[in-house]
């Protein structure tokens, strides 16, 4: 059998780990077998990736099916946990965007060399505070599954977990929005699902709470995009306030 191996000869006149990482990053990208998160794993070894990967080892993520054998093998659970971290760092909803995930892995790799003027307007962080807050929100959702086990199977869908997580984060930074209600959320979730697939151009259905319709539409199609995530948040906020 014949094999082709990429070979790159480099001469380093100085000790530069970042340069070496860039070389291996190019080689890994040319291999065309690694997904984006696996490439990050090969390139970074600082605070952000260490935090995300260590967090992924918690059994809680297996309990709610965020971590499964298939997802873990491709590091998709780590990628999703990275999104939760970014939501926490920015205190706002973000759409699924590989570029901003890459930016966070780079900017928060070495916290001592953080770029205050970064193009993403990402803030400098207190790593201990971020970990503490992450643990608080995780425990809050864990307690919800104990309060009502019906929530647990819903969480295997990343969009549901992200919707709850981002709402909890935002409500703690905005006292004007209604508090999260597990009972109301499960009603919203189940009633929205009962509608089946609703056309995105439908504004309302006769006799149906409009928030059910809005949540249903935002939960379909490209449901990890920013507009859909915000639409689910707005439907939750309106429903909790009723």
How should these model regions be labeled?
Residues 1-106, 201-206, 212-226, 230, ...:
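Basic- and aromatic-enriched surface patches that contact anionic nucleotides/nucleic acids
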Residues 93-242:
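C-terminal subdomains that position terminal phosphate/3'-OH groups for nucleotidyl transfer/ligation
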């Amino acid at each position: 059998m014949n094999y082709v191996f990429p070979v790159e000869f480099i001469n380093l006149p100085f000790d530069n780990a970042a340069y070496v990482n860039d070389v291996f990053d190019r080689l890994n990208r040319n291999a065309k077998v690694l997904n984006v998160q696996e490439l990050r794993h090969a390139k970074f070894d600082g605070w952000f990736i260490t935090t995300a990967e260590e967090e992924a080892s918690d059994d809680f993520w297996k309990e709610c099916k965020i971590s499964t054998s298939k997802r873990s093998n491709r590091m998709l659970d780590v990628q999703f946990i990275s999104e939760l971290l970014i939501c926490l760092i920015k205190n706002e909803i973000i759409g699924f965007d590989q570029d901003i995930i890459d930016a966070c892995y780079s900017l928060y790799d070495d916290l001592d060399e953080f770029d205050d003027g970064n193009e993403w307007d990402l803030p400098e962080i207190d790593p201990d505070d971020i970990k503490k807050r992450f643990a608080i929100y995780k425990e809050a959702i864990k307690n919800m599954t104990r309060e009502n086990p019906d929530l647990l199977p819903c969480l295997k869908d990343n969009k549901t977990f992200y919707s709850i997580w981002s709402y909890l984060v935002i409500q703690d930074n905005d006292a004007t929005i209604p508090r999260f209600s597990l009972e109301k959320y499960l009603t919203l979730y189940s009633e929205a699902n009962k509608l089946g697939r609703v056309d995105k151009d439908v504004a309302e259905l006769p006799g149906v709470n409009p928030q059910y319709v809005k949540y249903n539409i935002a939960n379909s199609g490209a449901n990890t995009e920013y507009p859909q995530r915000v639409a689910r948040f707005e439907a939750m906020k309106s429903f909790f306030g009723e």
